[in-house]
């Protein structure tokens, strides 16, 4: 008799995606981050659901409702900090996942890659709106500064900003709609993740060599399920160490001050995972130019398949490209650090140089290095 998991309409889908899925035999731990992102998303939805039960999306009570969650709700403090630090873990996994895709040429699967970029944008939008909800000083001023960037769009900019605000400033209407969107977006992300997986399973996974692994596949279960469980345990360990020992390490002290439209904080900055993009935005003195550079810094990922000039997809056997890739990583870390510093000398010039380097590496140096490697290999 055939096993029920292979015949039942619903179990068959699960079976083909997580049990009998043919996977390359040589994929490394860099391929763990997809499942870790799934775990992060589930964790964020669950903790967020419990937070939403006690949170009130009103300017007069939002801040005190978060305080109430931490002080009066049973284990409210751990739920709140798991949600806040869970977002940081989510972005660490996201950046690793995207970095793996760039290094090993996973952008060859264009549908999967493009949906991945849309997922990145959706996650960034969700995290931004979530940061506004506690209604602290940094929440309010972060929302004011970032939404105001849309006013740089010619003709419709000002109207667009006021439409998003629901008034003439960030106020009750803004907070209510941000809460509504912050609640619905993770479910949209989950649906997009399903489509992401659907396209991935059409082509099969990439592997470190970048060569087709059709001749050498192994079942996903038990080999990669056990590997993913190890990754999940390490992720939860890291998250709980952060939550239980240093929950405010990645937060901003200004967000423990209730929002005050009459008092601007000395240094407005977003959460650490947006600092690289914020540094690029700040590097350009022109408002519209800065906004375009900010959007392009992420949107440039969609161009990766078009910028690929090498005859090999993976960087595994391409030392020059490897070197440039790690310079790019160092450049992004520099941008992240600069974005968190005040707008003064020498941080302005460091940010500008790092921003130029970022676009130069992706658009010019890496394609040139790939062509050079082709010539060295006489291809």
UniProtKB/Swiss-Prot annotation:
Q: Which GO terms describe its molecular function?
A: metal ion binding; ubiquinol-cytochrome-c reductase activity
Q: Does the record carry Nucleotide-binding as a key word?
A: no
Which residues make up the binding site for heme b b566? 97, 196
For this UniProt record, the keywords arranged alphabetically read as follows: Electron transport, Heme, Iron, Membrane, Metal-binding, Mitochondrion, Mitochondrion inner membrane, Respiratory chain, Transmembrane, Transmembrane helix, Transport, Ubiquinone
Q: Which residues form a coiled coil?
A: none
Q: Which GO terms describe its biological process?
A: mitochondrial electron transport, ubiquinol to cytochrome c
Q: How does it sit in the membrane?
A: Multi-pass membrane protein
Q: Enumerate the residues binding a ubiquinone.
A: 201
Checking CDD domains in the record gives: cytochrome_b_C, Cytochrome_b_N
* SUPFAM superfamilies for the chain: a domain/subunit of cytochrome bc1 complex (Ubiquinol-cytochrome c reductase), Transmembrane di-heme cytochromes
> Highest taxon of the source?
Eukaryota
This entry's comment on the bound cofactor is: Binds 2 heme b groups non-covalently.
Annotated Gene Ontology cellular component terms:
mitochondrial inner membrane; respiratory chain complex III
- What compartments host this protein? Mitochondrion inner membrane
Matching entries from InterPro entries are given as:
Cyt_b/b6_C, Cyt_b/b6_C_sf, Cyt_b/b6_N, Cytb/b6-like_sf, Cytochrome_b, Cytochrome_b_C_euk/bac, Cytochrome_b_N_euk/bac, Di-haem_cyt_TM
Query: What cofactor does this chain's UniProt record say it requires?
Result: heme b
Describe the family membership recorded for this protein in Swiss-Prot or TrEMBL. Belongs to the cytochrome b family.
Quaternary structure, per UniProt, is: The cytochrome bc1 complex contains 11 subunits: 3 respiratory subunits (MT-CYB, CYC1 and UQCRFS1), 2 core proteins (UQCRC1 and UQCRC2) and 6 low-molecular weight proteins (UQCRH/QCR6, UQCRB/QCR7, UQCRQ/QCR8, UQCR10/QCR9, UQCR11/QCR10 and a cleavage product of UQCRFS1). This cytochrome bc1 complex then forms a dimer.
Query: Which PANTHER family does this UniProt record tie to the protein?
Result: CYTOCHROME B
A further note on this protein reads: Heme 1 (or BL or b562) is low-potential and absorbs at about 562 nm, and heme 2 (or BH or b566) is high-potential and absorbs at about 566 nm.
* Described function: Component of the ubiquinol-cytochrome c reductase complex (complex III or cytochrome b-c1 complex) that is part of the mitochondrial respiratory chain. The b-c1 complex mediates electron transfer from ubiquinol to cytochrome c. Contributes to the generation of a proton gradient across the mitochondrial membrane that is then used for ATP synthesis.
Protein known as: Cytochrome b
The species this protein belongs to is Cephalophorus leucogaster
């Amino acid at each position: 008799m055939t096993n029920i998991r292979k015949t039942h309409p619903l179990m068959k889908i699960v079976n083909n995606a997580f049990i009998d899925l043919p996977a390359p035999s040589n994929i490394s731990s860099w391929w763990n981050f997809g499942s870790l992102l799934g775990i992060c998303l589930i964790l964020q939805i669950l903790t967020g659901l419990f937070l939403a039960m006690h949170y009130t999306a009103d300017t007069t009570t939002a801040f005190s409702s978060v305080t109430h969650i931490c002080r009066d709700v049973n284990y409210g403090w751990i739920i709140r900090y798991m949600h806040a630090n869970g977002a940081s873990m989510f972005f660490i996994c996201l950046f690793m996942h995207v970095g793996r895709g760039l290094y090993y040429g996973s952008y060859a699967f264009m549908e999967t890659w493009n949906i991945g970029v849309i997922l990145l944008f959706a996650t960034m939008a969700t995290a931004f709106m979530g940061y506004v909800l506690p209604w602290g000083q940094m929440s309010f001023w972060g929302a004011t500064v970032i939404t105001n960037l849309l006013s740089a769009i010619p003709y419709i900019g000002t109207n667009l900003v006021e439409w998003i605000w629901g008034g003439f400033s960030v106020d009750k209407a803004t907070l209510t709609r941000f809460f509504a969107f912050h609640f619905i977006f993770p479910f949209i992300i989950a649906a997009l993740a399903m489509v992401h997986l659907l396209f991935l399973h059409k082509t099969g996974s990439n592997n470190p060599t970048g060569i087709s692994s059709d001749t050498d596949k192994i079942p996903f279960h038990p080999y990669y399920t056990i590997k993913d469980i190890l990754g999940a345990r390490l992720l939860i360990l890291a998250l709980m160490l952060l939550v239980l020992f240093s929950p405010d390490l990645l937060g901003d002290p200004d967000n423990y001050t209730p929002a005050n439209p009459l008092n601007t904080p000395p240094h407005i900055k977003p959460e650490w995972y947006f600092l690289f993009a914020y540094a690029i935005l700040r590097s350009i003195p022109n408002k519209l130019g800065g906004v375009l550079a900010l959007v392009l810094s992420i949107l440039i990922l969609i161009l990766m398949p078009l910028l690929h000039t090498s005859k090999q997809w993976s960087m595994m056997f391409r030392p020059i490209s490897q070197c440039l890739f790690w310079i790019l990583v160092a450049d992004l870390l520099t941008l992240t650090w600069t974005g968190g510093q005040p707008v003064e000398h020498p941080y302005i010039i460091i940010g500008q140089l790092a921003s130029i380097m970022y676009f130069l590496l992706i658009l010019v140096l890496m394609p040139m290095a790939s062509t050079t490697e082709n010539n060295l290999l006489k291809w």
